[in-house]
């Protein structure tokens, strides 16, 4: 069974905090533990990590659109799976690019609409499109610019 090797989260906001661009390394698919205080972001992390697998999934009424900016800046979530049954290490990355748009409903209230596309990449060694190197943002004039 494939195991999660690394997870990359880009541009997720919650409780006044931001995950700008972080890679969580699970060192060859070993078990992982998130030990955070209440309000530390465990639910946000789990909900975010599930997005490439079940886009739009929510937990206990918290919607992924609550963690996205409304200014058309995309967020990315990527999971690198270590495949089993291969002679040399082999990886499969599943990813999603998320953004939200505010749409005016019939009752003149704004409705948060999730927009996304998914992508995949398989590889057996590091390359320009692996989870670490795929270019989804850069810093220009002290600000992050997202693609």
PLM segments and residue spans:
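Extreme N-terminal "head/tail" segments of very large remodeling/mechanoenzyme assemblies
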Residues: 1-145
């Amino acid at each position: 069974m494939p195991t999660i090797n690394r997870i990359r989260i880009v541009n997720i906001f919650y409780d006044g905090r931001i995950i700008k661009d972080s890679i969580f390394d699970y060192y060859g698919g070993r078990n992982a533990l998130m030990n955070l205080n209440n309000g530390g972001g465990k639910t946000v992390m789990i909900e975010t990590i599930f997005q490439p697998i079940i886009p739009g999934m929510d937990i206990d009424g918290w919607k992924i659109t609550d963690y996205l900016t409304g200014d058309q800046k995309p967020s990315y979530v990527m999971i690198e799976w270590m495949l089993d049954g291969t002679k040399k290490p082999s990886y499969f990355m599943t990813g999603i690019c998320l953004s939200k748009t505010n749409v005016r409903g019939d009752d003149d209230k704004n409705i948060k609409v999730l927009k996304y596309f998914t992508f995949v990449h398989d590889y057996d060694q590091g390359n320009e499109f692996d989870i670490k190197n795929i270019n989804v943002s850069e810093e220009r004039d002290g600000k992050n610019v997202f693609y």
